[in-house]
Swiss-Prot record:
EC nos: 1.2.1.38
Matching NCBIfam families: argC
PROSITE patterns per UniProt: ARGC
Alphabetical list of Pfam families matching this protein: Semialdhyde_dh, Semialdhyde_dhC_1
Reaction equation(s) it catalyzes: N-acetyl-L-glutamate 5-semialdehyde + phosphate + NADP(+) = N-acetyl-L-glutamyl 5-phosphate + NADPH + H(+)
Source organism superkingdom: Bacteria
Record has Oxidoreductase as a keyword: yes
GO MF annotation terms: N-acetyl-gamma-glutamyl-phosphate reductase activity; NAD binding; NADP+ binding
GO cellular component, one term: cytoplasm
Protein name: N-acetyl-gamma-glutamyl-phosphate reductase
Length: 351
């Protein structure tokens, strides 16, 4: 199967090239990047060497669709929407890593991504409704039948996978959920950004986007679908001075305050027992971002405070892999009829 990587020179695209160049099921048919178009790949990225040393090409529907079956769109928010319909009309399947199709309503996207909406005059509400939310552990069957997959954001991935077992079975209350997350600097992308300079964020930790972070509404939308009830929650992200990694601590209130940590761990383990990339840790063992770095795994742990009936769920992922491109490859595998984890048997280089 021929795969076009559109936006190949950003962090998401670079990860995609690195993963697909080793995968016998796929051939990289197109590398797109407007700023570097006309240059050889190996000149730009000698550390991800490609034997045929292809040119990076200008991003256009004609170039992308010429020899490709699937387009992996690793583009800024808003830009994917300018290509998606035309690519679908030419028979390609599309996996979008941006937020353009994560919402079932175009109006909701315009409200949350108002800056992008002012630039990109979209009229594709039908595609928003058609797109499948690409969280493989939750939506595998729908992904297998889809032609347009909207990959989740990194923060939503780190929050929804831990929450899903407890929301879907009514174990926790719908009110009072709090998500406290930390992300490495690569979550901000590859473009220059003052707040991501070493002298700005090194040796420090800071919160940002309180209450109105864009991923809040994405988490709430999917959590509400999983629960069957409207969910409103608190989400606070933090920037930590590491290149990659994401850690989330999630708080909720148990409907049955008699449940123990062991009970909640067994439930979590049973829910994800068929997923090789999800590791449920023993009670009182808590995940570290170091354990998942450079892998597509998610480590989970759970603890109950029996004094007040509250549950604490923890997760750790690599934000560039399970939080982004690794998850996109999972979706690609499912759409192509392969094992979800094909080509993603990655090992951590601890420490």
């Amino acid at each position: 199967m021929n795969v076009a990587i559109v936006g190949a020179t950003g962090y998401g695209g670079i990860q995609a090239v690195n993963l697909l160049k080793k995968n016998k099921n796929y051939k990289i048919s197109f590398l797109g990047g407007n700023k570097t178009s006309g240059s050889k790949w190996n000149d730009n990225f000698p550390f991800i060497y490609l034997d045929n040393d292809p040119y990076v090409e200008e991003i256009s529907v004609d170039n992308i669709s010429k020899n490709s079956d699937v387009a992996l769109l690793c583009l800024p928010n808003g830009l994917s929407s300018t290509l998606t319909r035309k690519l679908l009309e030419r028979g390609l399947k599309v996996i979008d890593l941006s937020a353009d199709y994560r919402y079932k309503s175009l109006d909701e996207w315009k409200k949350v991504y108002s800056k992008e909406a002012a630039i990109y005059k979209r009229n594709d509400d039908d595609l928003c409704k058609e797109a499948v939310y690409g969280l493989p552990e939750i939506n595998k069957e729908a992904i297998s039948k889809g032609r347009l997959i909207a990959c989740p954001g990194c923060y939503p991935t780190s929050a929804l996978i831990p929450l899903a077992p407890y929301l879907s079975q009514g174990i926790i209350e719908n009110e009072g959920i709090v998500i406290d997350s930390k992300s490495g600097t690569s979550g901000g992308g590859r473009e220059p950004n003052q707040k991501l300079l070493l002298s700005e964020c090194g040796e420090g930790l800071s919160a940002y986007g309180l209450i109105n972070h864009r991923h809040t509404s994405e988490i709430e939308q999917v959590a509400s679908l999983i629960s069957g009830n409207k969910i409103e929650l608190l989400f606070t992200p933090h920037l930590v001075p590491i290149p990659r990694g994401m850690h989330s601590t999630i708080y909720g209130r148990l409907r049955d305050p008699g449940l123990t940590s062991d009970d909640c761990r067994i439930l979590l383990d049973n829910y994800y027992r068929n997923f090789k990339n999800i590791k449920v840790l023993p009670v009182d063992t808590f995940p570290s971002t170091k354990w998942v770095k450079n892998t597509n795994q998610i480590f989970l742990s759970v603890k109950v405070d029996i004094r007040n009936g509250r549950i604490i769920i923890l997760s750790a992922i690599d934000n560039l892999l399970k939080g982004q491109t690794g998850q996109a490859i999972q979706n690609l595998n499912i759409m192509s009829g392969f094992s979800m984890d094909e080509g993603l048997e990655l090992t951590n280089n601890y420490p």
